[in-house]
Every structure is written in C-alpha cells, then in structure tokens.
Amino acid sequence: MYRLIPLRQLRRTAGVVFDEIVPSDIPVINGIDRVIHKANGISPGPCAGVARPWYMHIGQDDNLLVMRGERFVEIYCPIQKKKESFIITPDKIYKNDKLYCDQAAMIVWPAGIFHRIISGSDGSISVNFSTRTKEFDLSNNFNIFDLNTETGEYKVIRNGALDQPDFSYKYKDLNLLKILQS
C-alpha cells in the first residue's frame, strides 16, 4: 500500500544538511514533478459537491519528497479497504499523528492507490519522482474521484484532462493560418 524510503545522510556541517536518495530505491524515474501548494492548499479541491475528493493514478507510482512545509496525506487501498494518514515534513513523517520516521524520507504509493493532500498553514513544496507504467495516460492521470472508504466504491466526478493546460498557439490572423497550412 505504501513504503518509506529514508534518505541517506551524506553530510552535516554548520548550516548545511546534505542527503541523497539511493538510486536503486527508485528503479525507474519517468517524470520529476515540482508541486507547490499555497497555505492550506487542498489537492484535489472540492468538486461536484464532494468536499474531499481523491486522486488515483491508474498508471503511475508516486514517490513524494516534501522539501518545505508540511503535507497531510491520506491514502486508501481499494483492495484492502484500508486508509492511512500521514503528516510529512522535510525531516520527519508521522503516521496517524505518531512519529513514524525521524529523518528525511520519501513516501511511495503504487498505481491504484487513492490519495489526497492538504498542505499546512505555510504551504508546501514537494518533488514527486513518478514511475509510469504502460497504463499511464496523461488524459486520465489526474481524474478526480468520489470514494466511499467504507465500501471501496468509487466513481470519476471530473475528467482530469479538463484541467490540463492547452499549449497550442492561438492564431490571431486566420488568413495567416491558412497560408501556413497550404
């Protein structure tokens, strides 16, 4: 359902903390995602009348490292019908409000695990080292779900593709577009 990857301490000097992620701990990195939340940022936010919806990636494992602030993370396994709660800071991880890992660590959950996050009052910054499987598809990777954690039943309430930016150039002069296309 999840695992922790403690960072290896490489150096501690006055004013400097230097840690590393051992490369063998993440066999494949397909994407490196920088995620910045403002104060009390909620991800995903309220949607379709659901106050606290969920994400679930069909084809992506998440390897989350909090760099600044704190993240309140809930994950849910539909197979085990089990939910876990974490508070993740740059230096510690708490599970169910108890200290669980007293050092910098990355939390990992595989594809198929539901998750949702709230950032603390100072906001937060994280890096996610994503591992993408053959089922990865950006058009559904950020679908938003309504999930019943008692029964495990869920449904898509927002197509994640609707929130993806459109990077295409917008031609102001349609005559120019016609010339370019000829």
PLM regions and their residue ranges:
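Histidine-centered metal-chelating micro-motifs
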Residues: 104-117
